[in-house]
Amino acid sequence: MRDRFEEQALALGAAMQALGLVRELATAGRLDDAQAEPLMSSLVKPYEGDLDRLYGGPTALAPGLRRLVTQLTNPQSMESTRYLAGVMHLEKKLSKNRAMLGQLGEGLEAARRQADYFHPLHENVLRNLGALYGETISQLGPRIMVRGDPGHLQDERIAAGIRTMLLAAIRAASLWRECGGGKLTLILRRQRLVQAAHALLERVD
């Protein structure tokens, strides 16, 4: 069985990978399919207690794990810190809202069927998941204010991708909490998480 800190690092790495894609979409208007695929998998596949199976292991989340190490050891972007704090705050609020969790679950089930018909990164799937985020988590507040190129942010397709990646980050934060993560973990066990992330990266193919 994987070390619990490695489980936490894997989930946090997924969150950081999703937030990195939020920034890329907002500033450059593009989505890296290879990085997005494991994150979409976490939204359209049921979680059966195995993060490796859900995400595809450390190799699929290597970019996010590297971002996590940087964030925990030498944070260079206050934007990343703000996004991550916002995601964790919204996930905590969501966890206490049973009605919204039910609505979100129904929406994700519909997305699973759609992804089976098309594929997880199909434009229709991204659009519907983005709409689901807007109808649920965005209503919790406070909203995560994404900065970027105004032209990209006003593009409906790109905006849907941003919301979908935020949803994937919320999903990862939920899994991190299920693995025992919390605010004190980031404060008191920061170095242990860094070591766990390094250990995972050493196994990258």
Swiss-Prot record:
<comment type="similarity">
    <text>Belongs to the HflD family.</text>
</comment>
<protein>
    <recommendedName>
        <fullName>High frequency lysogenization protein HflD homolog</fullName>
    </recommendedName>
</protein>
<dbReference type="InterPro" id="IPR035932">
    <property type="entry name" value="HflD-like_sf"/>
</dbReference>
<keyword id="KW-1003">Cell membrane</keyword>
<dbReference type="InterPro" id="IPR007451">
    <property type="entry name" value="HflD"/>
</dbReference>
<keyword id="KW-0997">Cell inner membrane</keyword>
<dbReference type="GO" id="GO:0005737">
    <property type="term" value="C:cytoplasm"/>
</dbReference>
<keyword id="KW-0472">Membrane</keyword>
<keyword id="KW-0963">Cytoplasm</keyword>
<dbReference type="Pfam" id="PF04356">
    <property type="entry name" value="DUF489"/>
</dbReference>
<dbReference type="GO" id="GO:0005886">
    <property type="term" value="C:plasma membrane"/>
</dbReference>
